[in-house]
């Protein structure tokens, strides 16, 4: 039997070696080889952990409360901190009666938007005193890291009270000019929606909500933005128009018109991002779609004309907006990605063909 200290040593060694290989995710499954995701591609790591009982190791990573949750049939999410201070996001789950885990390796430092190659106009949006800013994209597209870059920029520049509500906490901030309180779902709070409502009583200037998963959280986030706070959050959507539609569709039919009006009154911007392999698969570059809350865009949202948002963004490039296809075209022209890769990630192949 491995004790807690030995479990820590095993996992820390695994993570340290994975970082050397530029691994972003480690997939561990009882009875199978370990798999790595490197620059978006999966590869087997046949020699890794083969001398250990995977069930024992993964159960040993959890505390008593987490093990109880797992034994009750629920997935378990938590942060794992190695002895050198690096944090990882861990998800442990069951598949075919076997235990499995995915470990997401986080950056050891909080990068800037410039380092991430994300449009720095996002900094300008974060200067707004109130409203809502959304960062969207598929799993693994770097949404949490983009938000961390924005929060850290605020921290260095403004005297604000920032409350983050996360599941789990990924990046830990050191208070500089801002006072930052970080709350973790399942540890400090029960859920996003109730934590948001509580945050309104805690004198915040900025509230970061890890994810807007349901109507209760969406409603609380919009209320926070309406009442004079800047709210940052994420959704698992792949474009600005789809993001607006997802928010509306997540609400009961009788509330959708009101939510549409609230969103039109508070939205400051949406950035959608995905990571595309480049350099022969040795690295990845972000492709983004960027929408700002212009009067024209907000009118389309208010009137339920979300199908016209993409066309409006294409004609509003001078104001800093761009669609995903516009950015894919730029990345191709600059030699970052191939036409083949661009076609894999576009949400409208016919439109992209017009650009190239």
Task: Provide a role label for each language-model segment.
Residues 1-356:
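Short, flexible helix-loop junctions that flank or precede catalytic/ligand sites
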């Amino acid at each position: 039997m491995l004790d807690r200290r030995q479990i820590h040593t095993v996992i820390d060694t695994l993570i340290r070696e994975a970082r050397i290989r530029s691994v972003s995710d480690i997939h561990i499954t009882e009875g199978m080889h370990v798999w790595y995701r490197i620059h978006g591609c999966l590869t087997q790591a046949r020699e890794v952990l083969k001398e250990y009982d995977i069930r024992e190791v993964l159960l040993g990573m959890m505390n008593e409360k987490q093990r109880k949750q797992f034994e009750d049939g629920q997935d378990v999410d938590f942060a794992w901190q190695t002895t050198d201070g690096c944090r990882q996001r861990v998800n442990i789950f069951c598949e075919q009666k076997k235990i499995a885990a995915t470990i997401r390796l986080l950056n050891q430092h909080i990068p800037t938007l410039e380092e991430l190659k994300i449009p720095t106009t996002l900094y300008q949006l974060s200067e707004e005193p109130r409203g809502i800013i959304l960062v969207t994209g598929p799993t693994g597209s770097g949404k949490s890291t983009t938000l961390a870059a924005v929060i850290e920029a605020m921290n260095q520049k403004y005297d604000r009270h920032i409350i983050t509500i996360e599941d789990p906490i990924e990046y830990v901030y050191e208070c500089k000019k801002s006072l930052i309180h970080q709350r973790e779902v399942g540890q400090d709070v029960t859920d996003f929606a109730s934590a948001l409502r509580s945050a309104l009583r805690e004198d915040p200037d900025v509230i970061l909500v890890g994810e807007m998963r349901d109507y209760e959280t969406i409603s609380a986030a919009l209320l926070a933005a309406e009442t004079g706070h800047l709210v940052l959050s994420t959704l698992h959507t792949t474009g600005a128009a789809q993001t607006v539609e997802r928010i509306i569709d997540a609400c009961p039919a009788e509330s959708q018109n009101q939510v549409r009006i609230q969103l039109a009154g508070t939205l400051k911007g949406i950035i959608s991002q995905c990571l595309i392999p480049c350099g022969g698969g040795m690295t990845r570059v972000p492709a983004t779609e960027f929408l700002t809350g212009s009067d024209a865009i907000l009118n389309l949202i208010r009137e339920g004309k979300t199908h016209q948002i993409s066309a409006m963004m294409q004609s509003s490039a001078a104001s800093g907006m761009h669609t995903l296809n516009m950015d894919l075209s730029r990345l191709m022209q600059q030699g970052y990605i191939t036409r083949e890769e661009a076609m894999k990630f576009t949400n409208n192949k016919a439109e992209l063909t017009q650009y190239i």
